[in-house]
Amino acid sequence: MYLTYLDSNSWLIEIAGKRILLDPWLVGPLVFGNIDWLFKGTRPKERPIPDNIDLILLSQGLEDHAHPPTLKQLDRNIPVVGSPNAAKVVQELGYTSITSLGHGESFTLNQSVEIKAVPGSPIGPTLLENGYLLKELASGFTISDEPHGYHSPSLKQFAPVDVVITPIIDLVLPIVGPFIKGTKSALEVAQWLQPQVMLPTAAGGDVEFEGLLIKLLRAVGSAAEFQATLEQNHLKTRVIEPTPGSRFELPLERRALAAYLF
């Protein structure tokens, strides 16, 4: 199993011989609702769009997960699996094979990878977007992804999970508090799922941000601090900080309990 971190929330996941592009923002700026004075993300150098993609997986319909300029550059015939909000985005862009997953629903890619949607991040007072469990059916190895650190207690039933992709630092706004939840949330999900590896997401990569929101943001925590917290809580989980753009193999060992069913 190989992964490549593509900055922000974006990953290339190579699992069971399939190449899954997760929440891609690879070209152009990142702006929410065309309000660039509030928040704007840019890349000093654009990422090349990976080729031979078997599936695009989108956790949310917001621009930092379903990034329209990037999605416009990708082949519209690539199958897409996403939250209902994300499905609307790619439908408007003319994608031809779209699967909208509600919480608890599953999609199987070529009888080799099972993708299960779980409750994810809140968007507004009533809407929960998606987190995902990706299971390699031949080995039982499983990846959990929740890009903003909102982990549903329903995940406990799927333990153990081998790899957890989640923020491990907090991004905090005055008065509002953390809107990216790392630290405590990441420790909690580590205790639930007992992962072999945790991979930080959302707050890293070769990107630059500007705008009023960025001036107010405060980051709390670090990978080294979180690794120490895991050890203090007697967890053997290893934190790996990937080099953006560099493909790496996950150092996973088979576990007797990995044969659970979704």
Locations of the language-model features?
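Conserved beta-strand hairpin/beta-sheet module of binuclear metal-dependent hydrolase folds
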Residues: 1-45, 128-147, 163
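Pre-active-site segment of Zn-dependent metallo-hydrolases
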Residues: 18-57, 68-73, 124, 150-157
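Active-site neighborhood of phospho(di)ester-bond hydrolases with catalytic His/Asp-centered motifs
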Residues: 22-23, 53-66, 81-84, 143-149, ...
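Active-site environment of divalent metal-dependent phosphoester hydrolases
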Residues: 29, 61-66, 87-90, 105-108, ...
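Active-site HxH/HxHxD metal-binding segment of metal-dependent hydrolases
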Residues: 42-107
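Local beta-strand N-terminus motif with an aromatic residue
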Residues: 53, 77, 160-161, 195
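Binuclear metal-ion centers of metallo-dependent hydrolases, dominated by the metallo-beta-lactamase
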Residues: 94, 98-105, 157-159, 174, ...
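Active-site-proximal loop/helix segments of hydrolase catalytic cores
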Residues: 121-192
